[in-house]
Swiss-Prot record:
Residues 12-37, 159-169 have a biased composition (Low complexity). Signal peptide: none annotated. Residues 126-146 have a biased composition (Polar residues). One of its GO terms (molecular function) is anaphase-promoting complex binding. This is WD repeat-containing protein srw1. The modification Phosphoserine is found at S62, S187, S214. The gene is srw1. Belongs to the WD repeat CDC20/Fizzy family. WD repeats lie at residues 246-285, 289-328, 331-368, 372-411, 414-456, 458-499, 502-541. Has a role in cell differentiation and cell cycling by negatively regulating cig2 and cdc12-associated cdc2. Down-regulates the level of cdc13, particularly in a nitrogen deprived environment. Regulator of cell cycle G1 phase progression. Prevents onset of mitosis during the pre-Start G1 period. Required for degradation of cdc13 mitotic cyclin B during G1 arrest but not during mitotic exit. The modification Phosphothreonine is found at T98, T177. GO terms for cellular component: nucleus.
Length: 556
């Protein structure tokens, strides 16, 4: 045996060695497992064996066969088609939101909506609820043409192909720049033609956006004012319940009102009761039995005088402070079911289909008669700020009158049942809400400046009353068949904030406290229920308010 660098190399011909000419160091292998000759280790023993094993690990032998070539890279990239919703697999699973996180989430969503409205002019509510677009969503964003003549820009994400397409087809369907001209400049001649009409329109309409002094657009203002009160809690029970035996269950009557003097008037059969909001004392103002019964009540806007409509068609004015009648006015031939004040003018609607305007300072019983309705007038509401009167009747008609004109300014016939519930918004000019009866079951909101309907809400039950909040941009509705509930609505989103339950029959009557903090509801179950819904912003003093019955006031 020869020695080579401390390794013993066999010289026997029975041991076959495979040599590789490409290696600078030849490695000896024993390919004959049944050979009688074994490798002999020199006298250094185990040390050489360990050194050889380390040397073999450092210089592995070349393989006898070439490795097959593979088309795989050094990283694994999965192949997925475009229909795979990757965002669903990687979306963080949200746990239950704490009150703080919920408010933060609502604030973030509102800010995102506001920012989108300012940048893209989009106020679509669907974006608020789905911040991540799914692969099947088609998103369209358009920028309106400006006066510089730049044409519209349209960015569209196409619907991805189905899962049967291969990865090569996915690359072909990748969104690309549209082939149309992105920036298209008009010639000076065309530009003058296109801008002439716009300039004329701007000059004719002072309400254009370019004349606005607000840092945000009008659409964004509506979004800000329509902030949702999702976390708001409404009372589950009323804070006071009063028995009202004999409270009529007639849909066409108005037998409950809360005056600025903080006194609640309610008619039970032929008697009128006064409940003091300060001392909670109850007083009987008058008993009309047996000659007549009460069909409507309405407090004057300032002062302690109460208007009372009767079944015989007369209208009486009472001083609640002294419980004495000041005057009686005739004019109707049948019962008076609706009353409404506009300063010193009292308007009354009767079953004779007529509306009468009365100046309580003048000796005449009335000075104007409106005859547009074809059936009983059951709803009347003045907008004193704009001198507009809204009337609703059993002929399913809603009419808007300009001051004391004999013909209506607008006549809406969109309801399919009697219109008793009417209320004006104290926060926006010309916004009117109306509600229909059992066959209609809808609340409709109108823009009386344009004569158009803004919203149509299907409530699922008879709408008996509507009343706008003095403190917040919300309105209350009371319902009869089949829900018998009280609902609170947000405007302009017209979303339901909450529901008040407790009455077991139709909620036919509704009134609000003078400070706008509480409401009282009356139902055919002969109960009056008091609810605290709003926070009072200011305190009103009845002693400092002037009355239209003040002798120092002059007749205009």
């Amino acid at each position: 045996m020869d020695e080579f660098d401390g390794f013993t190399r066999p010289t026997s011909s029975n041991s076959s060695a495979n040599r590789n000419s490409n290696n600078s160091m030849n490695r000896v292998e024993n390919n004959n497992s049944n050979s009688d000759s074994a490798n002999t280790v020199d006298s250094r023993g185990d040390a050489h064996t360990r050194m050889r094993q380390g040397f073999e690990k450092s210089f592995p032998s070349s393989p006898n066969k070439k490795r097959p070539r593979t088309n795989e890279g050094d990283r694994f990239i999965p192949s997925r088609d475009a229909s795979t919703e990757l965002w669903t697999g990687f979306t963080k699973v949200e746990g239950p939101l704490t009150p703080v996180k919920k408010k933060q989430s609502v604030a973030d969503r509102n800010f995102t909506t506001l920012l989108r409205s300012e940048l893209f002019g989009s106020n679509d509510e669907t974006f608020n609820n789905s911040p991540i677009a799914t692969p099947n969503t088609t998103i369209g964003v358009s920028t309106p043409r400006t006066d510089s003549g730049i044409d519209d820009i349209e960015l569209t994400q196409r619907t991805p192909p189905s899962s049967s397409h291969t990865s090569s087809s996915i690359l072909q369907n990748t969104p690309v720049t549209p082939s149309r001209k992105i920036f298209h400049y008009l010639s000076p001649r065309d530009r003058n033609k296109s801008s002439y009409g716009k300039k004329a329109q701007y000059q004719d309409n002072p309400n254009r956006t370019i004349y606005s002094l607000s840092p945000v657009r009008s659409i964004t203002k509506d979004l800000i004012s329509a902030s949702r009160l999702e976390g708001r809690e409404l009372p589950s029970i009323p804070y006071r319940v009063l028995d009202a035996p004999g409270l009529a269950g007639d849909f066409y009557l108005n037998l409950l009102d809360w005056g600025q003097c903080n006194m609640l008037a309610v008619a039970l059969a032929s008697r009128v009761y006064l409940w003091s909001g300060i001392s909670s004392e109850v007083t009987v103002m008058h008993n009309f039995y047996p000659t007549d019964t009460v069909t409507s009540l309405r407090w004057v806007q300032r002062g302690t005088h109460l208007a009372v409509g009767t079944h015989n068609g007369s209208v009486e004015i009472w001083d609640a402070a002294t419980c004495k009648k000041t005057r009686t006015m005739s004019g109707h031939t049948e019962r008076v079911g609706a009353l409404s004040w506009n300063d010193h003018v009292l308007s009354s609607g009767g079953r004779d289909n007529h509306i009468l305007h009365r100046d309580v300072r003048a000796p005449e019983h009335y000075f104007r008669v409106l005859t547009a309705h074809r059936q009983e007038v059951c709803g009347l509401e003045w907008n004193s700020n704009e001198n507009l009167l809204a009337s609703g009747g059993n002929d399913n008609a809603l009419m808007v009158w300009d001051k004391f004109e004999e013909k209506p300014l607008y006549s809406f016939h969109n309801h399919i049942a009697a219109v008793k519930a009417i209320t004006w918004s104290p926060h926006q000019r010309g916004i009117l809400a109306s509600g229909g009866g059992t066959a209609d079951r809808t609340i409709k909101l109108w823009n009386t400046q344009r004569g158009s309907m803004l919203h149509n809400i299907d409530t699922g039950s008879q709408v008996c009353n509507l009343l706008w909040s003095k403190q917040t941009n919300e309105f209350i509705s009371t319902h009869g068949f089949m829900e018998n509930e009280v609902a609170l609505w947000n405007y302009p989103s017209v979303s339901r904030v909450g529901t008040l339950k407790g009455h077991t029959d139709r909620v036919l009557y509704l009134a609000m406290s003078p400070n706008g903090e509480n409401i009282v509801t009356g139902a055919a179950d002969e109960t009056l229920r008091f609810w605290k819904l709003f926070d009072s912003k200011s305190k009103h003093s009845a002693s400092t308010m002037s009355s239209p019955f003040d002798p120092t006031m002059k007749i205009r």
